[in-house]
UniProtKB/Swiss-Prot annotation:
GO terms for cellular component: cytoplasm. Homotetramer. It comes from Chlorobium luteolum (strain DSM 273 / BCRC 81028 / 2530). L-aspartate binds at T119, N123, D124. It is found in: Cytoplasm. Keywords: Amino-acid biosynthesis, Arginine biosynthesis, ATP-binding, Cytoplasm, Ligase, Nucleotide-binding. This is Argininosuccinate synthase. GO terms for biological process: argininosuccinate metabolic process; L-arginine biosynthetic process; urea cycle. Pathway: Amino-acid biosynthesis; L-arginine biosynthesis; L-arginine from L-ornithine and carbamoyl phosphate: step 2/3. GO terms for molecular function: argininosuccinate synthase activity; ATP binding. ATP binds at A9, Y10, S11, G12, G13, L14, D15, T16, S17, G117.
Length: 400
């Protein structure tokens, strides 16, 4: 009888490290570990040897950086997608791509099951499993963290120690960290108390604003149809742009976020994020839209931004709704071309200037100097018509 084969999403962290042995023992199955590279800086080296030593029979390392930037991050940026107006969705954006990569490997390896290391009260279980259902509904899905005997990260670490499984978490510093090029999420430990300020050791890449340089960094970012194409006049690939802005932003203490957010499963959670490049690019992109988008489009697009952010956060990336919103967003971005100049200083991003060949700002209409070309006399008739409805209402319903 042919053995079962399980493809697991493997990060090398605590949960997925012990999951290899746990699944192998429980299902007497071959384990294929799949790691996707989304630009994370840590835990990439030696992952294959670690997975094999832990019990995996196969390992796939999939470089997803380019599609992550071009097909996911840029789409979210153009949409202005910030979950609950704060979170740039780094982890959430990566999940559908990682899930797709896992499905691709599972089909290639003739696996019968898929497994992920998401908790039973988190968002990621929804994101992975909804994607699995969208792309490979015939494959059985396993979620060990919803059924195994471990009740805390401490008990998981005890299991890892017992079976000589190397992990980076410790009982003294039990942070759960997820990282990709668009940002880092940090949770667990003392961070679960919303009144406790994040300890400095929780932050992975950003300098404390208080310790950031005393001299500001000025940066110019150029966009073409809503997509960043250069930094300080130098044309770059998307991946290089994000890396450069992460470097500049982190040095200047940009992108530290601390929020209480509403999870898909109905609970509130306290999340710490580091997202220097995302913070800078969303700010710059929004300011360029202010300059180039017609008023009603600019205002309505705020609603689309929230809808798009919810789609990403809630795990329905592979949906007709997202495809439909992309069509709207892409049309709005046709004039979003130009340059934005910013100042990065001790945790803050300040606008210094912006320009575009499609700018709707007309200085001769806006100025209060002798160059003013606005017809002031036209305002009287406009106001009379504009306020006619309220005037009529007040005549029927006089104020008391």
């Amino acid at each position: 009888m042919q053995r079962e084969k399980i493809a697991i999403a493997y990060s090398g962290g605590l949960d997925t490290s012990i999951m290899i042995k746990w699944l192998k023992d429980k299902y007497d199955a071959d384990i294929v570990a799949v790691t996707g590279n989304l630009g994370q800086q840590k835990e990439i080296e030696n992952l294959e040897s670690k997975a094999i030593a832990t019990g995996a029979s196969g390992f796939h390392f999939v470089d997803l950086k380019k599609p992550f930037v071009e097909d996911y991050i840029w789409r979210a940026l153009k949409a202005g997608a910030l979950y609950e107006d704060v979170y740039p969705l780094a982890t959430a954006l990566g999940r559908p791509l990682l899930a797709k990569a896992l499905v691709d490997v599972a089909l290639e390896e003739n696996c019968t099951m898929l497994a992920h290391g998401c908790t039973g009260k988190g968002n990621d279980q929804v994101r992975f499993e909804v994607t699995f259902a969208s792309l490979a509904p015939h494959l059985k899905v396993l979620a060990p963290l919803r059924e195994w005997e471990f009740t805390s990260r401490e008990s998981e670490m005890d299991y890892a120690i017992k079976h000589n499984i190397p992990v980076s978490a410790t009982k003294k510093s039990p942070y759960s960290i997820d990282e990709n090029i668009w940002g880092i999420s940090i949770e667990c430990g003392v961070l679960e108390d919303p009144m406790v300020a994040p300890p400095e050791d929780a932050y992975q890449i950003t300098t404390s604003p208080e310790n950031a340089p005393n001299e500001a960094t000025v940066v110019e970012i150029e966009f073409e149809q809503g997509v960043p194409v250069s930094v300080d006049g130098k044309k770059m690939a998307g991946l290089d742009i994000i890396n450069r802005l992460n470097e500049l932003g982190a040095k200047n203490g940009i992108g530290r976020l601390d929020m209480i957010e509403n999870r898909v499963v109905g609970i509130k959670s306290r999340e710490i994020y580091e997202a220097p490049a995302a913070t800078i690019l969303h700010f710059a992109h929004r300011e360029l839209e202010r300059l180039t988008l017609e008023k009603t489009v600019f205002q309505y697009k705020k609603n689309i931004a929230q809808d798009y952010a919810n789609i990403i956060y809630n795990g329905t990336w592979f949906s007709p709704m997202r495809t439909a919103l992309d069509a709207f967003v892409d049309d709005t971005q046709k004039p979003v071309t130009g340059m934005v100049r910013l100042k990065l200083f001790k945790g803050s991003v300040t606008l210094l200037g912006r320009q575009s060949p499609y700018s709707l700002y007309n200085e001769s209409l806006a100025t209060y100097t002798e160059a003013d070309s606005f017809d002031h006399k036209a305002a009287a008739g406009f106001i009379q018509i504009y306020g006619l409805g309220l005037k009529t209402f007040s005549e029927v319903h006089p104020a008391k």
